[in-house]
Each structure stands twice: as C-alpha cells, then as structure tokens.
Amino acid sequence: MAKEIVKELLPLIRVYKDGSVERLLSSENVAASPEDPQTGVSSKDIVIADNPYVSARIFLPKSHHTNNKLPIFLYFHGGAFCVESAFSFFVHRYLNILASEANIIAISVDFRLLPHHPIPAAYEDGWTTLKWIASHANNTNTTNPEPWLLNHADFTKVYVGGETSGANIAHNLLLRAGNESLPGDLKILGGLLCCPFFWGSKPIGSEAVEGHEQSLAMKVWNFACPDAPGGIDNPWINPCVPGAPSLATLACSKLLVTITGKDEFRDRDILYHHTVEQSGWQGELQLFDAGDEEHAFQLFKPETHLAKAMIKRLASFLV
C-alpha cells in the first residue's frame, strides 16, 4: 500500500503521513577527505553544538603548511531550506574548489531543514555557529575547540555567505550581528550573497504579474515559515519592504551580491543592492553579474568558463 502524502512542494520535497520525508532534488552525501585529489584541500566533519544538534564540514587548503593565517568563510548551502546538506556532493566539490582558489578555511553548516524545522531554525543554527567561531578568537571554547581554527585562522577576516536560501540565512545573520554582539566582540569583515533568495507580494521588474502568488518562491516561503508575520512580506524574506529593519546595520565592512541572467531572484537582488546603497550603510558594496546562467550554476558546472570566472571573482573578494 502506498504511503499517504500529506504535503509536497514539487519538485523539491514530499512529506508523508508517517512523518517520513522524501527530498527529491538532493544530491548524495559524500565523505570528507584528508586530501582532495583534485585540489589538495583537507576536510573533516565537526560538531558545533549538541542541543540543538548542529554539525558542519570544515575545509583547510593545502597552503596551511605556511605560517600565514587564513580567512574564515562561514558558508550556507542553497536548497530552499529543505534539500541538500553540508555534506552533499555538489557542496563538497564546490567548497574544495573555492577553498583552494581563495586560500580560505571554509565551514559549511549542516543547519536544520524543513519540514520538521521551520524558519527561524536555520537562522539560529547559523548564529550558534558564528558564536562557536567567535569562541575560538578569544580562546573561550573549552568544550569543542577546533585545532584548524586555533592554528590557522585569521579572526580579523571572517566572511559569511551562501547560495540562494543559504544567502538569505547569511543576510539575516549579518543583520542580527549588527544589533547583537558576538562573543569577544568578533567582527565580520565581509558578506558574500550569491543570488540571495528574496521575494515579496508585489511583482517587480521582469517578474510575472500573472501567477505571482503561485510562484515556487512564494510556495517555498509559505512552507518554510507559515506563521511569519506579514507572510511573504516578512523582512526575513523581503528586506526591502517598507518598515523593514534598516540595512544600514548590516554587520560587515564589505558586501558582494552576485546575480545571474537566468535567475528568478535577479530583480530582487538588484533591488536589495540598491536598498543597501541608499540605506546609509558605510561599507564597500559590490555587485557582480556572472552572466547568462541559472543561480548556483558554479556548483553544478564548475568546469565551465563562466563558473571559473565567477569562482575567481569570489576568491578575489575573500581576502
């Protein structure tokens, strides 16, 4: 007898009456590696916190054998808050490449996913991880210190970023850090938002007027945070809505927003960039158009000319 479906968000996820979940678009998980054969990057899995449980995969480039301290990049994967993981094939391959190209320590957070953990669970897991990083900067971590951070990290160069829904998480962490101090007063140097997932009730730019309320972006947010005050115009998903917290408080000294030609969030992300620019935010603001591609293409097709160019652009920012 077929299991009864109680909810589905196609083409992403299917939820059954018995509580089981089928994640339709997730790539397979792969193991961490002492040395990636293509890049020489080392990776391992670590526990950030026990209650609630948060884990991550940390990446260390081959150059760590020198005495130079390395920037830290706290990364949040995409997947509409409901598919993929810190350990999935595409994320693992991408961060091996980026860690090697940029010469950074990357930390990929395995935040809690829908449907059992609606937003803001992913935001909270991100904040927990930021505090965990900060605990290494001032040597207050006595429970689960990470030697790769203690021995190789430059805590004056902390970056926070991600793809699509992961970039949404990063944005919300940057806002929170602007209003709530991290342990030891750790500062975030940069934010890297690749095709961030933002949306709103009123179509803008090239967004289709007809069917806007039935768009996948709308359905994802209603699935992710069904009780959000304001619904799709909650500032978590629509940071440009009137009455949203000022983007002038973003807690980083420089911010890079990337867009692509075929991404449905393109106009939202250009508006976000403009809103930051007009907010009075005092940092260095950058916008990069990666070309005529879908969002997150550099994860799926890293060997292409445009992907290589984008990864080089990201690496030049993470310094």
Curated annotation (Swiss-Prot):
Motif (Involved in the stabilization of the negatively charged intermediate by the formation of the oxyanion hole): 77-79
PROSITE patterns assigned: LIPASE_GDXG_HIS
The protein's annotated pathway: Secondary metabolite biosynthesis; flavonoid biosynthesis
Nucleotidyltransferase recorded as keyword: no
Result for mutant: residue 164 to A/S: Reduction of both dehydratase and carboxylesterase activities
Family per record: Belongs to the 'GDXG' lipolytic enzyme family.
Protein name: 2-hydroxyisoflavanone dehydratase
Species of provenance: Glycine max (Soybean)
Lineage: Eukaryota, Viridiplantae, Streptophyta, Embryophyta, Tracheophyta
